[in-house]
Amino acid sequence: MLSTLACVARYLSGKEPGSGFWRVERESNGSEKIAIWDASLGPMPTQVEIDAAALPAVKAYRIPFNRAECSRRIFERYPAGRQLSALAGLYDSANVATMTDWIAACIAAENTAADAIEAATTVQAVEAVTVAWPV
């Protein structure tokens, strides 16, 4: 998961981590700084710009991150072929119900987390949101 400053750099630059356009490094005291900011992105963001972008940047990162994790969990447990077979009626209703209930629970857990992230008013509140994935 990206740090807050990395989320901000991604948000402000429109470039993904590892693209070579920017890099966040941890200093010896544990704080982070933007170590590389490509000139094609414009001037390096000021601390005021970083602070202003922190909340929307973290929200813009965490919601899709959780959605991707939801999809990963669903397809890991129930690959597309198995889901299609269930849809085609090749599994008994008890197995289909178990599968659809679990998938629905995953989606509901992710949606609950997304709602909490959207409602958050601080970066700390966003970072405190966890997804209660079904087992």
Language model regions located:
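A preference for well-ordered globular domain cores
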Residues: M1-V135
